[in-house]
Amino acid sequence: MGRPRHYSEQEFEALVSSALDELPIEFQRALEHVAIVVSDRGAENHAYGMYVGSKLGGSPFFGGGGSPDEIMIFRDTLVRDFGDDPNRLRAHVVQTVRHEVGHYLGFDEAGVNKLGL
């Protein structure tokens, strides 16, 4: 495994945007009021992504309630672990986006893993 290359904020946001564009249209519509945020706080959260808010039609998930729903995709940890190979990085960004969308749709960790997300 080589050294991860630097990905600018714009380059990484383009990967996230592409992953969102690949979602089924019904999922894209469901996300209209969810903020999608690229962050470099993955190392402190020990994660590639995080959903904060209320599950669709449900109760707060991971401290939500009152704040707008937000999906965070962590550039620092994804680039650190997969940035040496653009194809692997892209695949893991797609997987992370889908995983966090699964949480928004109401699935817990076991549920998204069972779905292969």
Please report, for each region that a protein language model flagged, where it lies by residue.
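Active-site rim/adjacent substrate-binding subdomains
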Residues: 1-92, 104, 111-113
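Short alpha-helical catalytic segment bearing the HExxH-like zincin motif
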Residues: 92-100
